[in-house]
Amino acid sequence: MLPAQHRMTRSTEFGATVSKGTRAAQPDVVVYRLRSDQTADPGPRVGLIVSKAVGNAVQRHRVSRRLRHAALAVLEDLDPSDRVVIRALPRSRDAVTPRLEQELRTALERIRQRTGAPS
């Protein structure tokens, strides 16, 4: 389970990250990352977007659990000021957790290369 301090819950955070953040697409997910300029951040925050295009409620919930698990695995690689939104694509309903984690790591690495950020 993703700790509460690392969960993105406000729609304004989601909106800012998606609209102003750097995007990297993978076959099963699209990842957006934005560096926050707030200095009192408790750590990186991660949000999930799993739309009805992914499948029915059971499938969406399964994908959400897998993505949360993958996000937890990469949490220590993120900077405390990072805001990350993971958008699940319809193909993600058939993806296993290790594949989602690998795609998340690949997407974050591509974003790092584009922005020139050290971490």
UniProtKB/Swiss-Prot annotation:
GO terms for molecular function: 3'-tRNA processing endoribonuclease activity; ribonuclease P activity; tRNA binding. One of its GO terms (cellular component) is ribonuclease P complex. GO terms for biological process: tRNA 5'-leader removal. Residues 1-20 are annotated as: Disordered. The gene is rnpA. RNaseP catalyzes the removal of the 5'-leader sequence from pre-tRNA to produce the mature 5'-terminus. It can also cleave other RNA substrates such as 4.5S RNA. The protein component plays an auxiliary but essential role in vivo by binding to the 5'-leader sequence and broadening the substrate specificity of the ribozyme. Its EC number is 3.1.26.5. Consists of a catalytic RNA component (M1 or rnpB) and a protein subunit. The lineage of its organism: Bacteria, Bacillati, Actinomycetota, Actinomycetes, Mycobacteriales. It catalyses: Endonucleolytic cleavage of RNA, removing 5'-extranucleotides from tRNA precursor. This is Ribonuclease P protein component. Keywords: Endonuclease, Hydrolase, Nuclease, RNA-binding, tRNA processing. Belongs to the RnpA family. SUPFAM superfamilies: Ribosomal protein S5 domain 2-like. It holds the Pfam family Ribonuclease_P. It comes from the Bacteria.
